[in-house]
Amino acid sequence: MLADRIAERAAALAERRGNTVAVIVVDLREISADISSALVSQLVTPRLQQAISALGEADGIIASTPVYKAGPSGLFTSFFDVLDNDLLIAKPVVLAATAGTARHALVADDQMRPLFAYLRTMTVPTSVFAAPEDWADPALNTRIDRAATELVLLMESGFARQVRDESWQSYQHELGSAGGTELAIDLDTDLMRLATGGAAG
């Protein structure tokens, strides 16, 4: 519900600014078994791959979770645990959380923000939190508007694309990752030919 409200504001703002927006919802409850399986087997099912691809192709992300045991849901963190570390580099992200009490208001900034910093995303400055008493509070709408505006402006700037185009090779990538740095290795050298059993030129 909170993510939907942020997405609606972001889409409306983007359209007012002359952009066409398609909102794709990834409901982790529908792929919970796929996420659990991937954690223990490293095998990604087609349904999970579809969700991962949706994030990889998105211009921006709204990452929203309920709070359980004073932290993001285990399903939420497990999903991001199975992602390629390079998938979301420089991707604009809004962090959002809901809980049954305002005592968990800092979960988005204290616990979610470090996770997305590790994934090297571009999280917007404003996170959004809602407890039951917040839904009718105009202050929540103000934060939603602010976060949506920050997201749209980052998406419009093409920041993520520019980072990939201009400085992708300066990031540390793992073999076989979305970074694909192994493809930059020159295989047509004497050393590589010798390593593969061929003769040096």
Predicted regions: what they are:
Residues 43-120:
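Helix-loop-strand module that forms the ligand-binding subsite of alpha/beta enzymes
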Residues 8-16, 117, 121, 149-160:
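Generic secondary-structure signature for well-ordered alpha-helical cores
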Residues 1-77, 181-201:
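N-terminal beta1-alpha1-beta2 submodule of the flavodoxin-like/Rossmannoid cofactor-binding fold
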Residues 19-21, 89, 124:
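Residue-level signal for beta-strand positions within conserved beta-sheet cores that form or flank
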Residues 24-33, 117-135:
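Mobile beta-alpha loop/short-helix "lid" or hinge segments that flank ligand
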Residues 2-6, 108, 147:
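Hydrophobic alpha-helical membrane-association signature
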Residues 38, 42-45, 102, 134, ...:
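Charge-dense, low-complexity intrinsically disordered segments
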Residues 129-201:
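Glycine-rich phosphate/pyrophosphate-binding loop and the adjoining helix
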